[in-house]
C-alpha cells in the first residue's frame, strides 16, 4: 500500500517529542508523491511542518484507531511500534487504572504505588479454572495458565518476574505463590502451602531493604520451585538465592536503610527476652544510621518483627535457634559500632578493652574478647620461611571489620535459606513443579560496579532465552495454521554473552587478575582494552582509563573498574574466622565450619533424574585449604546462572515484566521517559518487533465476518461458507496478497492492515451516516413545509369564517327585531282576550257548583235507606237457616248410630265363624311345615349326636375298664401311694375342667359381642351401597334435566357419545365387581377349607337386613355373610376375625372403586353441560333412552351377579368335594372316617336351611314392597290399624306383628332416603363448586397458554419449533406420569392381594396341621370342646414392627440401596414416614436401645449415601426432602403442644409416648443443613460453567454485540459453536430440571424458595465478578444483553411462582450494573443519576465498571477521567466495603420451617418394590 493511500487528510500520526517521548498529530492535507514534508496539526491546534524521507523510510508512525486504544493485549493493535505501545499502556494505567496488560506471552505489570483490592480470595477463585484470554490481564491469570499447562501437558513450568528495583517484582512473585498455595492446597495435613507463604516475610526481613527507588527492595535474586504431586497438590518447595548485596550491611546511601531485620530487632529490643542483646534504638548504631532516616512511612517494624517470628515458628525454627539468630544479628550491629583508635604513627590501631560494643559482640557470639580485640587490629602474613604478625592502619582495620560483618551476615543468610528449604522439603514423590524467578531487571546508574555487571549479565542470558522462546512460539503458530513462513530476523545477544563468559572473556580475565599477587583494577582494565577492543559490544570511554562500556541488548552501560577485584575476591581474614569457629555456641560455630566456603553462593543444581526435591546447601561442598584457592564470586555466579538457565530451558516459561511508572513513588503517575526506558530494557519492544515482523493481527473467520460484514456485498452474503466469504472480501479490499494469509482457523494480517480495514469500515459507516442524515434532513424540511402550508391555510380559513360570521350576525339582528315587534303585538292582544275569558269561566263555575250540591244531598238520603233494608233482610235469612241445619244434624246422627250398630253385630258374628279361623290358619301352614322340617333335622342331628355319644361312651367304658384293670394292678403293687396320686390327678383334672368352662363362657360372651359388631358392619355396608345407588340415579336424572334445551342434531350426537362413554364406564365397573366377586369367592373357599364344622341358623332370625336390591351386595352375598357369622362361632373367633378383616378390606376397595366411578360420572356430567341444548321432543326421547339404559344396566348387573353367585356356589361345592376327599384320605390314615363325614353332613344341612331362609326373605321382601305401594296409592284407607287390611295375598293373611314391623321398616327406609337425598344435594352443590373451580383453573391455564403462545410468536421459527417440542414433551411426560402412577397403583393392589392370598393359604395349611395334632391328642384325653383364645382385630395403628436382626436390611433397602426412581408415583417422602412408623413402634414397646440404634443407623446411612453420590442432584434432593420430613414427623408427633396445633385427633393418637427425641431432632437439623449445602454445591457446580457464557457472551439478542480484535490471547468462547458455549435457554432448562426434581421429591416449598434464591445469588455474583474483571464485556450492548437475560430469568421465576423467594433482590447488583452500562455518562446530572440508581453497587465496583467501559465502534465515546472523578467525589460519603468482587461462595443461612403433614400414619401403604416384607403392620 503506497504512502499516498496511508497518509491522507485526518490521518493521525506519532512524532517524537523531547518531553513526552511521543506526541500525537493529525494531517491537515493529503500526502503526495514527492512531498518533502507533512502538514500536521498538534493536539493544541499548533500547525507543524514535519520533514519526511520516504526513500529511507523516515516517516512518522501511524496511530491506531480509537477503537483499538486500551486493548488488553498490545499485539491486538494494528500498528505495532513504540509509541502505540506506550500510549496504550498510558491510557490503561491512567484512565482505566489497569496495571496489567498482555504483550503476547508477556504480562506487563506497572507498579501503581497504591494498594488495590484485586488480590483477594474472591479474585483468586474468579480466575481459577479460566482461560488466560477470558479475563482481564492479571498475575493470577499467568499463574492459572502455568498451573493449567502443568496439569494438561505434564511439563514443568516457570514464571520469570523481572524489572528494576521498585517495579514490583517481589510483590508479583508473592502473589503468584499465594495463588498456587490457594488453588493447589496441600494434599495432606502438613499445611505446606502455609509454609511456602510463610517464607516470604522471613526472606523480606533478611533480604529486603529500603532504597531511594523502593521502600521494600529485594537485594537478592531468588528462584522458588513449588513441587506438586500427581493430583497437583503442593507437596514441597525449594529456594535458590542469587547475589546477595552484602555491602548494604556496612554501607547505605542517603535516605536508604539497611536490611529490615536490623530495624525490626531494634524496635523489639524492649521485650524481656531481648534484654541480653543490649540493643537500643536504630539511630544508636553505625550500621543502621548510615542512611539517615531509619523509619519507613506506613511501616511498623515491631509488627513486622512479630510476623517474622511467627513465620520462623511455622517453619519449625526452635525458639533457641531464633534467639541465636537474633544474637548474631545484634552482634553485627555491635561490631559496626566498635570504636577503633589510631596510633600516632598511623600504621597501627587499637581498641579499648572497655569498649562496650566489643564486649557485647564477643558475649553474644560466645568468643574470647582478647583474641577478637587483637585480631581486629592485626593480621598474619605467611611466607615460605616464617610467619609475621603485622599491624594494620585505621582504614585497613575498618575494612577488615566491615568484611567480617558482611561475611557473618552472608553466612547467616545462607543458613536461614537452607533451614527454610529443609522445612519445605517433603518425602513424597514430586511429579512436577512450577518455578518462580524473582531477579533484578536491567540496571544502569551513573556509577555502575560489579553488582550491576552481574545483574546485567544475568538479564542478557534471560533475554536470549526469551527471544528464542518467542520465536519458537511464532513458528509453532504459523505451522499449526498451515501458512508459509519465512525466517524472522531477531536480535541475538550471543556475542555479548560470549564477551562476558567465554574463554578469556571479562569474567575470565577478572578471575585471572584476582589470582595475581599484586593485581589491581587498573591492570585488569588495561587487559580488557587490549583483548576486546575490536569487539562490537565492548568500548573504551574517551575520558577514562579505568572504565569500560558494554553494549547490552537494552542499552550501553559504562562500568567503573574500581572495586571489581575486591568484590570478586570477597576477602575475609582467616584469623577472625578461626575465632568464630571456636565459639561456644553451636550455631555460630556451625556457620563457619571448615566444610563450608566463606563466600555466599546459590544452591547447586538438583538431580534432574530424580523426581524429589533435593535440599542442598547454597554453598559448594568443596573443602579448600585456604582463601587463595576458593572460587571467586564471579565464577560462582556464572555457574549458578548456567544451572538456572538449564532449569528454565527444561520448563515452559511465562514472563512477567514489571515497570516502574515514576521515580517519585507517586500513585498512578506515569513518566513516559522512564517507562520507555524500561520497556526497551525488559524486552517488551523486542517482542513487539518480532510480532510486527510477521503477522501480528489474527482474526478467526467467525469474528472477521461479524466485524466486517458491513464491507461485504449482498451477493457475497448469499454464500453459506463464511470462510469463502472472508477470502473473497479480503482479496477485493486488499490488493497486495502478501499483506494477509489464510490459515486453517484464522486470518493473519501484516501490521497496519487491521487499521486499514477499520478505516474502510469507518468510511462505510460515515457514508451510511451521511445518507441517513441527508434523508432525515430532507424529511425534516418536508415536514416543516407541510406544517407552514397547513398554518397558512388555517389562517385563511379563519379569516373567511370571521367575515362570514359578522355578516350572518347582522342579518340575524335584523330578523330578530321584526320577530320581537310581532311577538309584542300578539302578547298585547292575548292579554285582553284572557281577561274576558277568565271572568266568564268564574261565573259558570259558581252556577254549576250550586246545581251539583243540590243533587248530592238527594242521592245521600236514598243510599242510607237502602243500607237499613239490607241488614234487616240478612238477619231474617240467618235465623231461618239455623233452624233448618239443626234439624238435619239430628236426623244424620240417628241414622249413623243405627248403621254402626248393624255393622258391629255383623262383625261379631263373622269373628265367631270357622271360616275366618281357616283363613288365618292358611297363612301359618308354611311356617308349620318349616318348623316341622326343622324339628326333623334336629331329630336327625340329635340321633347323630346320640350315636356319637354312644360311641364315645363305649370307648369311654373301655377306657374305664382298662383303667380299672390298671388300678387293680397298681393297687396290688402300691395300694396307698397310687390311690393318693389318682385322687390328686382327678382333682386337678376337675379344676382344669372348671377353668376351661369359665373361659368358654367368657369367650362366648366376647363372640356374641363380636358377632353383633359384624352384623352392624354389614348393615353399614348395605346402607353405603344404597347411598351410592341413589346418588347414581340422582346424577342420571340431573344429567337428563340439564339437557332439556339442547339442539336436536347436536343433542343426538352428544347423547350417543355420552352413552358410549357410560357403557364403557359401566363395563369397567362390572369388571371391577367381577374382580371383587372372584376375590370374595377365593376368600370363601379358603374360609370353608378352614371350617371344621357348621352350625344351623336359628329359624326365627330376622332377615330384614337383606332387604335391599343394591347391586354391590346381593341376597346371596348376605347369605354368605350369614355363613361367615356362623363360621365364626364354629371355627374359632381368632381365625374368623382375621378372615372377616379381609372381607371388610375388600368392601372398602369396592367403596373406593365406587368413588372413582362417581368422579368419572362427575366428568361425564361436565361434558354434557358443555353440549348444546336440544328440542323438547328429542329430549324426552333421550330421557326414555337413558331410563331404559339404566333399567337394562340394573337388570344386566343383577343377572350377572346372580350368575356369578351360582358359579361361585358350584366352585364352592367342587372345592368342598376336593377338601372332603383329601380329608377322607387324611382321616383314613388316622382311623377316623366318621368324624369328617359328620362334618360334611352338617354342612349340607346348613346349606339346605340357607336356601329355605333365602326363599323366606324373598317372599317377605315382596310382600313388604307391595304393601307399601298399596298403602301410598290407596285413597279410602283409614289410619286405624285394627281395621281390615287388604294385603297383596288376600288368601294368605300375614300376622299383625309382622305387618307392623314391616310398616316401621318402610317408614325408617323413607326417612333414610330423605336423609340421603339431602346429603346428595349437599354433595351436588360441593361438586358444582368443584367444577367451577376446575373451570377457573382451566381459564387460567388457557390464559397462560395464550401468553406463552404470544411469546412464542416473537421467537424465530427454529426457536418456535423447539419451544413447541418442549411443550409437547412436557405434556406427554405429565400424562405418562399419570398413567404410570395409575398402573403402579393397580399393580400394587394386585401384589398386595396376592400376598394376602399366600398368607391365608399358609394359615390354612397350619390350621390343618393343628387340627390333625388336636385329633391325635383327643384320643388320649377326655372329649372336651376346643376353646380358642379370642384376639380382637384392630385397625392398622400406623406402627411397623421389625426384628433387631433385620435393622441392617431395613437400612440397606430403605436408605443405602434405595433409588429415587423406585418411588415415583408414590407418596412423597415415603422413607421418612416408614422410618417414623418403625421409631413409633420402638417407642410403643419402650425399647430405647432400638430407638437409638435405628436413628443412628439411619443418620449414618444417609451420610454414606450422600458421600457416595456427592455429585447427584436428584439423590441429594431426595434425601434432603426425606430428612426434613423425618424431622417434621419427629416434631409433629413429639407430644409438644407447640407442634400439635394443626394435628387432627387421629394424628394426636400417633404421638410418641415414652421418649423425648429433642437431641436427635437437632442432629437431623444439622444433617439437613449439610445436605442443603451439598445440594447447593452440586447445583452451583452444574450451573457455574454455563453462567458466563450464557449471561455475558451468548447473543440473546442477535446482532447486538460487536466483535473487537483480541490479540495473542484469544478468548476461549470466541470460536463459533464452541464446546463451552451456552445460551440462556441452557440455564433455564437446568433450572427447570432442578425445580421439577425438587417438587417431585416433595421438598418443602419454603426450602425450594431458599434454594433458588441461593442459585440466583450465585448467578449474580459470578456474572458481576466476570463483568468486573473483563474489559471486553463492559459495553452498551452487553448491558442490553444482560437486561434481557435478567428479564427472562425474572419471567421464569414468576412462571414457577418463585418470585417471593427474594431471588430478584439478589440480582439487584447485576441489574444496576447493566443499567450503568447503558446510562449516559457525560454531565453532572448523569453522575447524580448514577449515584442515586446504583445503590447496591459499591463505589469501587461503580468506578471499576466506568473504567472498564469500552466502546464497540467509533460512534461511542469513552468515559472521561473527569466524569469518574465526579462520581468518586459524590460517593465519598458512602461507607462501602473495600471488597471489589462479590463472594460467590457465600451461602445464605438456611431456615427449615415447621411444615406438618396432613397424612396419618395408618394411611401409608408400603410398595412391594421396597422389599420390606419383614416389616409387620401393627
UniProtKB/Swiss-Prot annotation:
UniProt domain Dilute: residue ranges: 1496-1773
Entry superkingdom: Eukaryota
Cysteine disulfide links: none
InterPro entries to which the protein is assigned, alphabetical: Dilute_dom (IPR002710), IQ_motif_EF-hand-BS (IPR000048), Kinesin_motor_dom_sf (IPR036961), Myo5b_CBD (IPR037990), Myosin_head_motor_dom-like (IPR001609), Myosin_N (IPR004009), MYSc_Myo5 (IPR036103), P-loop_NTPase (IPR027417)
Compartment annotation: Cytoplasm
Positions of region (Requires for interaction with LIMA1): 21-40
Binding positions (ATP): 163-170
Gene Ontology terms describing biological process: endosomal transport; modulation of chemical synaptic transmission; protein transmembrane transport
SMART domains: DIL, IQ, MYSc
Bias-annotated ranges (Polar residues): 1098-1118
Molecular function in Gene Ontology: actin binding; ATP binding; calmodulin binding; cytoskeletal motor activity
Domain IQ: 765-794, 788-817, 813-842, 836-865, 861-890, 884-913
Entry keyword annotation includes Transport: yes
Sequence positions bearing Phosphoserine: 1416
Sequence segments annotated as region (Actin-binding): 641-663
Domain Myosin motor: 69-762
Keywords on record: Actin-binding, ATP-binding, Calmodulin-binding, Coiled coil, Cytoplasm, Motor protein, Myosin, Nucleotide-binding, Phosphoprotein, Protein transport, Repeat, Transport
Location of region: Disordered: 1086-1120, 1161-1188
Subunit relationships: Component of the CART complex, at least composed of ACTN4, HGS/HRS, MYO5B and TRIM3. Interacts with RAB11FIP2. Interacts with RAB11A and RAB8A. Found in a complex with CFTR and RAB11A. Interacts with NPC1L1. Interacts with LIMA1.
Function of the molecule: May be involved in vesicular trafficking via its association with the CART complex. The CART complex is necessary for efficient transferrin receptor recycling but not for EGFR degradation. Required in a complex with RAB11A and RAB11FIP2 for the transport of NPC1L1 to the plasma membrane. Together with RAB11A participates in CFTR trafficking to the plasma membrane and TF (transferrin) recycling in nonpolarized cells. Together with RAB11A and RAB8A participates in epithelial cell polarization. Together with RAB25 regulates transcytosis.
Protein's UniProt name: Unconventional myosin-Vb
Annotated source species: Mus musculus (Mouse)
Protein encoded by which gene: Myo5b
Amino acid at each position: 500500500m503506497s504512502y499516498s493511500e496511508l497518509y491522507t487528510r485526518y490521518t493521525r500520526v506519532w512524532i517524537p517529542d523531547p518531553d513526552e517521548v511521543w506526541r500525537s498529530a493529525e494531517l491537515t492535507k493529503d500526502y503526495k508523491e514527492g512531498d518533502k514534508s507533512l502538514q500536521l496539526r498538534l493536539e493544541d491546534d499548533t500547525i507543524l511542518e514535519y520533514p519526511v524521507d520516504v526513500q529511507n523510510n523516515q516517516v512518522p508512525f501511524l496511530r491506531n484507531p480509537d477503537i483499538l486504544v486500551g486493548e488488553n493485549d498490545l499485539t491486538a493493535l494494528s500498528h505495532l511500534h513504540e509509541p502505540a505501545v506506550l500510549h496504550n499502556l498510558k491510557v490503561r494505567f491512567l484512565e482505566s487504572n489497569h496495571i496489567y496488560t498482555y504483550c503476547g506471552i508477556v504480562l506487563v505489570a506497572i507498579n501503581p504505588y497504591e494498594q488495590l483490592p484485586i488480590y483477594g480470595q474472591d479474585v483468586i477463585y474468579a480466575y481459577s479454572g479460566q482461560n488466560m484470554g477470558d479475563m482481564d490481564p492479571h498475575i493470577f491469570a499467568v499463574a492459572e495458565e502455568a498451573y493449567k499447562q502443568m496439569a494438561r501437558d505434564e511439563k514443568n513450568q516457570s514464571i520469570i518476574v523481572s524489572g528494576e528495583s521498585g517495579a514490583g517484582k517481589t510483590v508479583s512473585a508473592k502473589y503468584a505463590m499465594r495463588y498456587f498455595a490457594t488453588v493447589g492446597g496441600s494434599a495432606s495435613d502438613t499445611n505446606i502451602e502455609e509454609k511456602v507463604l510463610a517464607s516470604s516475610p522471613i526472606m523480606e526481613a533478611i533480604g529486603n531493604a529500603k532504597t531511594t527507588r523502593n521502600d521494600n527492595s529485594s537485594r537478592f535474586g531468588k528462584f522458588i520451585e513449588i513441587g506438586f504431586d500427581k493430583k497437583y497438590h503442593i507437596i514441597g518447595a525449594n529456594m535458590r538465592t542469587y547475589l546477595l548485596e552484602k555491602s548494604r550491611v556496612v554501607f547505605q546511601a542517603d535516605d536508604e536503610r539497611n536490611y529490615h531485620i536490623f530495624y525490626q530487632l531494634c524496635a523489639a529490643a524492649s521485650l524481656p527476652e531481648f534484654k541480653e542483646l543490649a540493643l537500643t534504638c536504630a539511630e544508636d548504631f553505625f550500621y543502621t544510621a548510615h542512611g539517615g532516616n531509619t523509619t519507613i512511612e506506613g511501616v511498623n517494624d515491631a509488627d513486622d518483627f512479630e510476623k517474622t517470628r511467627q513465620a520462623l515458628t511455622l517453619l519449625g525454627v526452635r525458639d533457641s535457634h531464633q534467639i541465636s539468630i537474633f544474637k548474631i544479628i545484634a552482634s553485627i550491629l555491635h561490631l559496626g559500632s566498635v570504636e577503633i583508635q589510631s596510633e600516632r604513627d598511623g600504621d597501627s590501631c587499637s581498641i579499648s578493652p572497655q569498649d562496650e560494643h566489643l564486649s557485647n559482640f564477643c558475649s553474644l557470639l560466645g568468643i574470647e574478647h582478647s583474641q577478637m580485640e587483637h585480631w581486629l587490629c592485626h593480621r598474619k602474613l605467611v611466607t615460605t620461611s616464617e610467619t609475621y604478625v603485622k599491624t594494620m592502619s585505621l582504614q585497613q582495620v575498618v575494612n577488615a571489620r566491615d568484611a567480617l560483618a558482611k561475611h557473618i551476615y552472608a553466612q547467616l543468610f545462607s543458613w536461614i535459606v537452607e533451614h527454610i528449604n529443609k522445612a519445605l522439603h517433603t518425602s513424597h514423590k514430586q511429579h512436577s513443579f512450577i518455578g518462580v524467578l524473582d531477579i533484578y531487571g536491567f540496571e544502569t546508574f551513573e556509577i555502575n560496579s560489579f553488582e550491576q555487571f552481574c545483574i546485567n549479565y544475568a538479564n542478557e542470558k534471560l533475554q536470549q532465552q526469551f527471544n528464542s522462546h518467542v520465536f519458537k512460539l511464532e513458528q509453532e503458530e504459523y505451522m499449526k495454521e498451515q501458512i508459509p513462513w519465512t525466517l524472522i530476523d531477531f536480535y541475538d545477544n550471543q556475542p555479548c554473552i560470549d564477551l562476558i563468559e567465554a574463554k578469556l572473556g571479562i569474567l575470565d580475565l577478572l578471575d585471572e587478575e584476582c589470582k595475581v599477587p599484586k593485581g589491581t583494577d587498573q591492570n585488569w582494565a588495561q587487559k580488557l582494552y587490549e583483548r576486546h577492543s575490536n569487539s562490537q559490544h565492548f568500548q573504551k570511554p574517551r575520558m577514562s582509563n579505568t572504565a569500560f562500556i558494554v553494549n547490552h541488548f537494552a542499552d550501553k552501560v559504562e562500568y567503573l573498574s574500581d572495586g571489581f577485584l575486591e568484590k570478586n575476591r570477597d576477602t575475609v581474614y582467616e584469623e577472625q574466622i578461626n575465632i568464630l569457629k571456636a565459639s561456644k555456641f553451636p550455631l555460630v560455630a556451625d556457620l563457619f565450619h571448615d566444610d563450608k566456603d566463606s563466600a555466599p553462593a546459590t544452591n547447586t543444581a538438583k538431580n534432574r533424574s530424580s523426581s524429589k526435591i533435593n535440599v542442598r546447601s547454597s554453598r559448594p561442598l568443596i573443602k579448600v585449604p585456604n582463601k587463595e584457592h576458593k572460587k571467586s564470586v564471579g565464577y560462582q555466579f556464572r555457574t549458578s546462572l548456567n544451572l538456572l538457565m538449564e532449569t528454565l530451558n527444561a520448563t515452559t516459561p511465562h514472563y512477567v515484566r514489571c515497570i516502574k511508572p515514576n521515580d517519585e513513588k507517586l500513585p498512578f503517575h506515569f513518566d513516559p521517559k522512564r517507562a520507555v526506558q524500561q520497556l526497551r530494557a525488559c524486552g517488551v519492544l523486542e517482542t513487539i518487533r518480532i510480532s510486527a515482523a510477521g503477522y501480528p493481527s489474527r482474526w478467526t473467520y467467525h469474528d472477521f465476518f461479524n466485524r466486517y460484514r458491513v464491507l461485504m456485498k449482498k451477493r457475497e452474503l448469499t454464500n453459506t461458507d463464511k470462510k469463502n466469504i472472508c477470502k473473497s472480501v479480503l482479496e477485493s479490499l486488499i490488493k497486495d496478497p502478501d499483506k494477509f494469509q489464510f490459515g486453517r482457523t484464522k486470518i493473519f494480517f501484516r501490521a497496519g492492515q487491521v487499521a486499514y480495514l477499520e478505516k474502510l469500515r469507518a468510511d462505510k459507516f460515515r457514508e451510511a451516516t451521511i445518507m441517513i442524515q441527508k434523508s432525515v434532513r430532507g424529511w425534516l424540511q418536508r415536514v416543516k413545509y407541510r406544517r407552514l402550508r397547513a398554518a397558512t391555510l388555517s389562517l385563511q380559513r379563519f379569516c373567511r369564517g370571521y367575515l362570514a360570521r359578522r355578516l350572518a350576525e347582522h342579518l340575524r339582528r335584523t330578523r330578530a327585531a321584526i320577530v320581537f315587534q310581532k311577538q309584542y303585538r300578539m302578547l298585547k292582544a292575548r292579554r285582553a282576550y284572557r281577561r274576558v275569558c277568565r271572568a266568564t269561566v268564574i261565573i259558570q263555575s259558581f252556577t254549576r257548583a250550586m246545581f251539583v250540591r243540590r243533587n248530592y244531598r238527594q242521592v245521600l238520603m236514598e243510599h242510607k235507606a237502602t243500607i237499613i233494608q239490607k241488614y234487616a233482610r240478612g238477619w231474617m235469612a240467618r235465623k231461618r237457616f239455623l233452624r233448618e241445619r239443626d234439624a238435619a244434624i239430628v236426623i244424620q246422627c240417628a241414622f249413623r248410630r243405627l248403621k254402626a250398630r248393624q255393622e258391629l253385630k255383623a262383625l261379631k258374628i263373622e269373628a265367631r265363624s270357622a271360616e275366618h279361623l281357616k283363613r288365618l290358619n292358611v297363612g301359618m301352614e308354611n311356617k308349620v311345615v318349616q318348623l316341622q322340617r326343622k324339628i326333623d333335622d334336629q331329630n336327625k342331628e340329635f340321633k347323630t349326636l346320640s350315636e356319637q355319644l354312644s360311641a364315645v361312651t363305649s370307648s369311654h367304658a373301655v377306657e374305664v375298664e382298662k383303667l380299672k384293670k390298671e388300678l387293680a394292678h397298681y393297687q396290688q403293687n402300691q395300694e396307698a401311694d397310687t390311690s393318693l396320686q389318682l385322687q390328686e390327678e382327678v382333682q386337678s383334672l376337675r379344676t382344669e375342667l372348671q377353668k376351661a368352662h369359665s373361659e368358654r363362657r367368657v369367650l362366648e360372651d366376647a363372640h356374641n359381642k363380636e358377632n353383633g359388631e359384624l352384623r352392624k358392619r354389614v348393615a353399614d355396608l348395605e346402607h353405603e351401597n344404597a347411598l351410592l345407588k341413589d346418588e347414581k340415579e340422582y346424577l342420571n336424572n340431573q344429567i337428563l334435566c340439564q339437557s332439556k334445551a339442547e339442539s336436536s342434531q347436536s343433542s343426538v350426537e352428544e347423547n350417543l357419545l355420552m352413552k358410549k362413554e357410560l357403557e364403557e364406564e359401566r363395563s369397567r365397573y362390572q369388571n371391577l365387581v367381577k374382580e371383587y366377586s372372584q376375590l370374595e369367592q377365593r376368600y370363601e373357599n379358603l374360609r370353608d377349607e378352614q371350617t371344621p364344622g357348621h352350625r344351623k341358623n336359628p329359624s326365627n332370625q330376622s332377615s330384614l337386613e337383606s332387604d335391599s336390591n343394591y347391586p354391590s351386595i346381593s341376597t346371596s352375598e348376605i347369605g354368605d355373610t350369614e355363613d361367615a357369622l356362623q363360621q365364626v362361632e364354629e371355627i374359632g373367633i381368632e381365625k374368623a376375625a382375621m378372615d372377616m378383616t379381609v372381607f371388610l378390606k375388600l368392601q372398602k376397595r369396592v367403596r373406593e372403586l365406587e368413588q372413582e366411578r362417581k368422579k368419572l360420572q362427575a366428568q361425564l356430567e361436565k361434558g354434557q353441560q358443555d353440549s348444546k341444548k336440544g328440542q323438547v321432543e328429542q329430549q324426552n326421547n333421550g330421557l326414555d333412552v337413558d331410563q331404559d339404559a339404566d333399567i337394562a344396566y340394573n337388570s344386566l348387573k343383577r343377572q350377572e351377579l346372580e350368575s356369578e353367585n351360582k358359579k361361585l356356589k358350584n366352585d364352592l361345592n367342587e372345592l368342598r368335594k376336593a377338601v372332603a376327599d383329601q380329608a377322607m384320605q387324611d382321616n383314613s390314615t388316622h382311623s377316623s372316617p366318621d368324624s369328617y363325614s359328620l362334618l360334611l353332613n352338617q354342612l349340607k344341612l346348613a346349606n339346605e336351611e340357607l336356601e329355605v331362609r333365602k326363599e323366606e326373605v324373598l317372599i317377605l321382601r315382596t310382600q313388604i314392597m307391595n304393601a307399601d305401594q298399596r298403602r301410598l296409592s290407596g285413597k279410602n284407607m283409614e289410619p286405624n290399624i285394627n281395621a281390615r287390611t287388604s294385603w297383596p295375598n288376600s288368601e294368605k293373611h300375614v300376622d299383625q306383628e309382622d305387618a307392623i314391623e314391616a310398616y316401621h321398616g318402610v317408614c325408617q327406609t323413607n326417612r333414610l332416603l330423605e336423609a340421603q337425598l339431602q346429603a346428595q344435594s349437599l354433595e351436588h352443590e360441593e361438586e358444582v363448586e368443584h367444577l367451577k373451580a376446575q373451570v377457573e383453573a382451566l381459564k387460567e391455564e388457557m390464559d397462560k397458554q395464550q401468553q406463552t403462545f404470544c411469546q412464542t410468536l416473537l421467537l424465530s421459527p427454529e426457536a418456535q419449533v423447539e419451544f413447541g417440542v418442549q411443550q409437547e414433551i412436557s405434556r406427554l411426560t405429565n400424562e405418562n406420569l399419570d398413567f404410570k402412577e395409575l398402573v403402579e397403583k393397580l399393580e400394587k393392589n394386585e401384589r398386595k392381594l396376592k400376598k394376602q392370598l399366600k398368607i391365608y393359604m399358609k394359615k390354612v395349611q397350619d390350621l390343618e396341621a393343628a387340627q390333625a395334632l388336636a385329633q391325635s391328642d383327643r384320643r388320649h384325653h377326655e372329649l372336651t370342646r376346643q376353646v380358642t383364645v379370642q384376639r380382637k382385630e384392630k385397625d392398622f395403628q400406623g406402627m411397623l414392627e421389625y426384628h433387631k436382626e433385620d435393622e441392617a436390611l431395613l437400612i440397606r433397602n430403605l436408605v443405602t440401596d434405595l433409588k429415587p426412581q423406585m418411588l415415583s408415583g408414590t407418596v412423597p417422602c415415603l422413607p421418612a414416614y416408614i422410618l417414623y412408623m418403625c421409631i413409633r413402634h420402638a417407642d410403643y414397646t419402650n425399647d430405647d436401645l432400638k430407638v437409638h440404634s435405628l436413628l443412628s443407623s439411619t443418620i449414618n446411612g444417609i451420610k454414606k449415601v450422600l458421600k457416595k453420590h456427592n455429585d447427584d442432584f436428584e439423590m441429594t434432593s431426595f434425601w434432603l426432602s426425606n430428612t426434613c420430613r423425618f424431622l417434621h414427623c419427629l416434631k409433629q408427633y413429639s407430644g409438644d403442644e407447640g407442634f400439635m396445633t394443626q394435628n387432627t385427633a387421629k394424628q394426636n393418637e400417633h404421638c410418641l409416648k415414652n421418649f423425648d427425641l429433642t437431641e436427635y431432632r437437632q442432629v437431623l437439623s444439622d444433617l439437613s443443613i449439610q445436605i442443603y449445602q451439598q445440594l447447593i454445591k452440586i447445583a452451583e457446580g452444574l450451573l457455574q460453567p454455563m453462567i458466563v457464557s450464557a449471561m455475558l457472551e451468548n447473543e440473546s439478542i442477535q446482532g447486538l454485540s460487536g466483535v473487537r480484535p483480541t490479540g495473542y490471547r484469544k478468548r476461549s468462547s470466541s470460536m463459533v459453536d464452541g464446546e463451552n458455549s451456552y445460551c440462556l435457554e441452557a440455564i433455564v432448562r437446568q433450572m427447570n430440571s432442578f425445580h421439577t426434581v425438587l417438587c417431585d421429591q416433595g421438598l418443602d416449598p419454603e426450602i425450594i424458595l431458599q434454594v433458588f434464591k441461593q442459585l440466583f445469588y450465585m448467578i449474580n455474583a459470578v456474572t458481576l465478578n466476570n463483568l468486573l474483571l473483563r474489559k471486553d464485556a463492559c459495553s452498551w450492548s452487553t448491558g442490553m444483553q444482560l437486561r434481557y437475560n435478567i428479564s427472562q430469568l425474572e419471567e421464569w421465576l414468576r412462571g414457577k411462582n418463585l418470585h417471593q423467594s427474594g431471588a430478584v433482590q439478589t440480582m439487584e447488583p447485576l441489574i444496576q450494573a447493566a443499567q450503568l452500562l447503558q446510562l449516559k455518562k457525560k454531565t453532572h446530572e448523569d453522575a447524580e443519576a448514577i449515584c442515586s440508581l446504583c445503590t447496591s453497587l459499591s463505589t469501587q465496583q461503580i468506578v471499576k465498571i466506568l473504567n472498564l467501559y469500552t466502546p464497540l465502534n467509533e460512534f461511542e465515546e469513552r468515559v472521561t477521567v473527569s466524569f469518574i472523578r465526579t462520581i468518586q467525589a459524590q460517593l465519598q460519603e458512602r461507607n462501602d466495603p473495600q471488597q471489589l468482587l462479590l463472594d460467590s461462595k457465600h451461602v445464605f443461612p438456611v431456615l427449615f420451617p415447621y411444615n406438618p403433614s396432613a397424612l396419618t400414619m395408618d394411611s401409608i401403604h408400603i410398595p412391594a418394590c421396597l422389599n420390606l416384607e419383614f416389616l409387620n403392620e401393627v
